[in-house]
Amino acid sequence: MAIISSKKQPPEPNGQPNKRPESAPAAPKEKVLQPEAAIDEQGKQEESIRPQKFADYIGQKDLKDVLDIAIKAAKSRGEVLDHLLLYGPPGLGKTTMAMILASEMGVNYKITSAPALERPRDIVGLLVNLKPGDILFIDEIHRLSRMTEEILYPAMEDYRLDITVGKGSSARIRSIPLSKFTLVGATTRVGALTSPLRDRFGLIQKLRFYEVDELSQIVLRSAQLLQTQVTDDGATEIARRSRGTPRIANRLLKRVRDYAQVKSCTEVSQNIAAEALQLFQVDPCGLDWTDRRMLSVIIEQFNGGPVGLETIAAATGEDTQTIEEVYEPYLMQIGYLSRTPRGRTATKAAYKHMGFTPPNEQLSLL
């Protein structure tokens, strides 16, 4: 329930040391593997490569099938699409999917994020201005304040906004009807959502990491839109190093394009892509300096682990949330890192990739 004053307010402003490889990880040059959207990717060029319909959206077949059924059913009944919660690692296309839903339903959409909805009037202003069928996309929805969540409860269930006008004995509750809308929430931490909020979503879907062949198609499509010549092998080379994430694939493509242009290359071949990505310290498995530093700390300083998250964060200079949400999921997916109740451990594959020999006790377990 929102509390709104009737007075107008002014605007606010351990074991034996292992043999070290010949070359230790160098200091990072640029974080080209961070899946968070960069400033230069918020302009027209980013929008130009973003798919506008399901036919152009590569990958996530299971998700597209589920949403296609939901859209067709809602259209046939003349109803709005049910509220949808999308969760998964950053950069997999949650925002893009919300835009495609609006396009497929033939409605408008509004995009915001939970940290921007600090005060009740922030979310109230969005809700009262929604038109019938509109889609409201809230990114990082797990970071909503308790008061904002409580405003959303009746809005999601009954399309109603309950507000308290005035204070003290003169206060009164007023219900404002809202247009029927669809709330699409996105989060990287679905477990952080409160049960009352999570249970109000009719559809809860997970986005998975992409396969190399899917990312190759994304790279080729983006290259065509960016008017850049990329060979199939060049696209595959970029895709292999993109950590299963389309946003990273598109970012690496732009960096490789810059490299090819400066080197006067007419097209991006596999060799050119490999040379460019080596310059940016992205290895053939998609690991960057922070990934290698994490594995190096676990292997060299703690004999393979287990190591606590806070210790890894201190050694790499990253915060614990970034490590948990950005780096660990991919390292676990490719089998380089394991999470145990006692901490993080490096796997045999990680030892091999980093150029170390696993200790005997770990070899017996693997």
Swiss-Prot record:
InterPro entries: AAA+_ATPase (IPR003593), AAA_lid_4 (IPR041445), DNA_helicase_Holl-junc_RuvB (IPR004605), P-loop_NTPase (IPR027417), RuvB-like_N (IPR008824), RuvB_C (IPR008823), WH-like_DNA-bd_sf (IPR036388), WH_DNA-bd_sf (IPR036390). It is an enzyme of class 3 (hydrolase). It comes from the Bacteria. Keywords: ATP-binding, Cytoplasm, DNA damage, DNA recombination, DNA repair, DNA-binding, Hydrolase, Nucleotide-binding. One of its GO terms (cellular component) is cytoplasm. Residues 13-210 are annotated as: Large ATPase domain (RuvB-L). GO terms for biological process: DNA recombination; DNA repair. The keyword Glycoprotein does not apply. Residues 284-366 are annotated as: Head domain (RuvB-H). Mg(2+) binds at residue 95. The keyword Cell inner membrane does not apply. Residues 1-49 are annotated as: Disordered. Gene3D superfamilies: 1.10.8.60, P-loop containing nucleotide triphosphate hydrolases (3.40.50.300), Winged helix-like DNA-binding domain superfamily/Winged helix DNA-binding domain (1.10.10.10). Residues 211-281 are annotated as: Small ATPAse domain (RuvB-S). One of its GO terms (molecular function) is four-way junction DNA binding. DNA binds at residues 339, 344. ATP binds at residues 49-50, 91, 94-96, 157-159, 200, 210, 247. It catalyses: ATP + H2O = ADP + phosphate + H(+). Its main location: cytoplasm. The RuvA-RuvB-RuvC complex processes Holliday junction (HJ) DNA during genetic recombination and DNA repair, while the RuvA-RuvB complex plays an important role in the rescue of blocked DNA replication forks via replication fork reversal (RFR). RuvA specifically binds to HJ cruciform DNA, conferring on it an open structure. The RuvB hexamer acts as an ATP-dependent pump, pulling dsDNA into and through the RuvAB complex. RuvB forms 2 homohexamers on either side of HJ DNA bound by 1 or 2 RuvA tetramers; 4 subunits per hexamer contact DNA at a time. Homohexamer. Forms an RuvA(8)-RuvB(12)-Holliday junction (HJ) complex. HJ DNA is sandwiched between 2 RuvA tetramers; dsDNA enters through RuvA and exits via RuvB. An RuvB hexamer assembles on each DNA strand where it exits the tetramer. Each RuvB hexamer is contacted by two RuvA subunits (via domain III) on 2 adjacent RuvB subunits; this complex drives branch migration. In the full resolvosome a probable DNA-RuvA(4)-RuvB(12)-RuvC(2) complex forms which resolves the HJ. Has 3 domains, the large (RuvB-L) and small ATPase (RuvB-S) domains and the C-terminal head (RuvB-H) domain. The head domain binds DNA, while the ATPase domains jointly bind ATP, ADP or are empty depending on the state of the subunit in the translocation cycle. During a single DNA translocation step the structure of each domain remains the same, but their relative positions change. PANTHER family: HOLLIDAY JUNCTION BRANCH MIGRATION COMPLEX SUBUNIT RUVB (PTHR42848:SF1), PTHR42848. Belongs to the RuvB family. This is Holliday junction branch migration complex subunit RuvB. The lineage of its organism: Bacteria, Bacillati, Cyanobacteriota, Cyanophyceae, Nostocales. The gene is ruvB.
